[in-house]
Amino acid sequence: MLSCRLQCALAALCIVLALGGVTGAPSDPRLRQFLQKSLAAATGKQELAKYFLAELLSEPNQTENDALEPEDLPQAAEQDEMRLELQRSANSNPAMAPRERKAGCKNFFWKTFTSC
């Protein structure tokens, strides 16, 4: 009984010392500065990529438009659709995109049916 109490007391003492050592550890300002720079660089790269994509999509290809013949019209429509889709994907947030629901579709999730 005494050895069990002693083991519990030693375990509690070790936990208290470990927590005290972690909270009392000095924070490294270089690490904090590095993390801030990396976060700023990541958002800057993402904004730069969106800017270049928008610029690329907004440039008209004059040589293709001037030499457009009637049989090329369906291909031009497809290119316009692809361009619009790329613009939508660049402007929209993929994490916030709403899911399309189908009529009468049901999913089985955790013992219940939910509509898709």
From Swiss-Prot:
Q: Which residue positions does Threonine amide occur at? A: T43
Q: InterPro entries annotated for this entry?
A: Somatostatin, Somatostatin/Cortistatin_C
Extract the coiled-coil ranges from the record. Answer: none
Enumerate the UniProt keywords alphabetically: Amidation, Cleavage on pair of basic residues, Disulfide bond, Hormone, Secreted, Signal
Q: Does the UniProt entry include the keyword Secreted?
A: yes
**One biological process term in Gene Ontology:** hyperosmotic response
Which cysteine pairs are joined by S-S bonds? C105-C116
Question: Which Pfam families does this UniProt record tie to the protein?
Answer: Somatostatin (PF03002)
MF terms from GO for this chain are: hormone activity; receptor ligand activity
Cite the propeptide residues by number. 35-88
Q: Does the keyword Lyase apply?
A: no
Cellular localisation: Secreted
Cite the record's tissue specificity text: In the pancreas, somatostatin is expressed in delta cells of the islets of Langerhans. In the stomach, it is expressed in parietal cells of oxyntic mucosa and in the small intestine, it is found in the villus (at protein level). Neuronostatin is expressed in the pancreas in delta cells of the islets of Langerhans, as well as in the stomach, in parietal cells of oxyntic mucosa and in the small intestine, in the villus (at protein level).
Q: Name one GO cellular component term.
A: cytosol
**For this UniProt entry, which segments traverse the membrane?**
none
Segment forming the signal sequence = 1-24
Modifications the protein undergoes after translation, according to the UniProt entry? C-terminal amidation of the neuronostatin peptide is required for its biological activity, including for the regulation of mean arterial pressure.
| PANTHER family hit by this protein | SOMATOSTATIN
Q: Which family does it belong to?
A: Belongs to the somatostatin family.
Please state what the protein is called. Somatostatin
Native organism: Mus musculus (Mouse)
Q: Its gene?
A: Sst
